[in-house]
């Protein structure tokens, strides 16, 4: 008997955070997808302006991407936990899954701050 969408959602709602993380990992493996792809940045508001010189506009939102953890993996995991608020296991999974998005849609100042903290810990970071 197939479970309905509502039954599945109710089952997920009753799971602990760790069970949900394990479920997501199992779904990623089974279907060959990543959860990070589902969290794509939304398009910027007010985007259909048609002003000329649009390519010359200064970028206001940045995605912070962890490219590599370098030689200090433990330090980078601590830094990722500090800037994201993730738990130890989740931060470790992010660091081991390089390249991985750390923060999407961040302001220039916030993105530079996160980049500095991660690079101080030994990571390679890109701003997009």
UniProtKB/Swiss-Prot annotation:
It comes from Halorhodospira halophila (strain DSM 244 / SL1). This is Large ribosomal subunit protein bL12. The gene is rplL. Keywords: Ribonucleoprotein, Ribosomal protein. It holds the Pfam family Ribosomal_L12_N. Belongs to the bacterial ribosomal protein bL12 family. HAMAP family: Ribosomal_bL12. Gene3D superfamilies: 3.30.1390.10, Single helix bin. One of its GO terms (cellular component) is cytosolic large ribosomal subunit. Homodimer. Part of the ribosomal stalk of the 50S ribosomal subunit. Forms a multimeric L10(L12)X complex, where L10 forms an elongated spine to which 2 to 4 L12 dimers bind in a sequential fashion. Binds GTP-bound translation factors. Forms part of the ribosomal stalk which helps the ribosome interact with GTP-bound translation factors. Is thus essential for accurate translation. One of its GO terms (biological process) is translation. GO terms for molecular function: mRNA binding; structural constituent of ribosome. The keyword Ribonucleoprotein applies. SUPFAM superfamilies: ClpS-like, Ribosomal protein L7/12, oligomerisation (N-terminal) domain. The keyword Transmembrane does not apply. NCBIfam families: L12. Coiled coil: none annotated.
């Amino acid at each position: 008997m197939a479970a309905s969408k509502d039954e599945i959602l109710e089952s997920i709602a009753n799971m602990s955070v760790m069970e949900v993380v394990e479920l997501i990992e199992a779904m990623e493996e089974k279907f060959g997808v990543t959860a990070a792809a589902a969290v794509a940045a939304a398009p910027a508001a007010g985007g259909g302006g048609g002003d000329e010189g649009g390519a010359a506009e200064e970028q206001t939102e940045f995605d912070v991407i962890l490219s590599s953890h370098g030689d200090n993996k433990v330090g980078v995991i601590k830094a990722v936990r500090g800037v994201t608020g993730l738990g130890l296991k989740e931060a470790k999974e992010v660091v081991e899954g390089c390249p991985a998005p750390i923060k999407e849609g961040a302001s220039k100042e916030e993105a530079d701050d996160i980049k500095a903290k991660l690079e101080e810990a030994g990571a390679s970071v890109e701003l997009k």
